[in-house]
Amino acid sequence: MEEIRKTYVVNEKEREYIYFKVRFNRFRDISGSIAHEVSDKEEWAETEAVLCLPESYTADGDETQLVLSFHGAGGRVCAQEDKTGGVAYVPKLYEAGYAVLDICGAEPHGLTMGCPEHIFAAYKAYRYAIKHYNLSDKVLVMGASMGGHVTINFINTYPSIVLAAGMFYPRLNMDGVTVDGHYCIGTWDKTTRKDGNPSTKDRIIDIYRFPSEEWCEERTIGFNPYRVRSFINQEGKRVVIPPCPIKIWQGTEDVTVDPVMVQEFVDSVKRAGCYIELHMLEGIGHKTTPVMRDELVMWFNRFI
């Protein structure tokens, strides 16, 4: 498979970014057919991926630890446009000796919000990376903003390859959630169209293949982060059971991701007796800070 290599200056150092494309099967059997015939099929699509290797990388010897770093709604991966997706969020990771990988998504615009095809495509990119480079087959997973959807869905879909996850101001609920009388807006609630582009709600209807413009719980099963691997306990509280340790960084002044929703997700994981950490940052909005980047490295260092 052809690769494109580009060099960018990051933190006053030249870094090489390796772009490549992977094919994935985007078919989902949602027809409901009861005919006694093969209904599954291969519906091939292609997505672009980008990999950044640290200076310490070697083609033989010890494997380099791989991190999957998933971009948010404002990011994408595209060599032609010099877009590096979630790799751009975490320069301190490759400075610390980690390799970092992201994909565009199941559609060229990248705004696929953790839908099944996005997760399957990310796995294909992971397989390509560990096959062609001397990288670990157990991964650390990171996501920012809408990349929180992708992160949670990836670790739940492929738990056997994940060591731990970290997320910056993650979007965690597709549909709205009420916490102690406070309504936490879901991505489904975002109906505003900008510059002629589809709204977030429109994107969900498209990429999750809803049969109409009404919310369709069935089409989101397994890929709605707050509801995956979860149940309601006797007190009426949701209990979420993630497959690996998680740490989240969230600003108290974030108006894009509701801090109340993030706290509720953390509490729901703790109700399950699972390990999760939260660093709530006073006065910080929807942005990445040096504290987040420094602590992400420290968090991931615990698992290698």
Functional labels for PLM-detected ranges:
Residues 113-133:
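Alpha/beta-hydrolase active-site loop
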Residues 278-288:
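Histidine-bearing beta->alpha loop at or near hydrolase active sites
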Residues 153-215:
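Hydrolase active-site cap/lid region
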Residues 2-61:
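N-terminal cap/lid segment of alpha/beta-hydrolase-fold proteins
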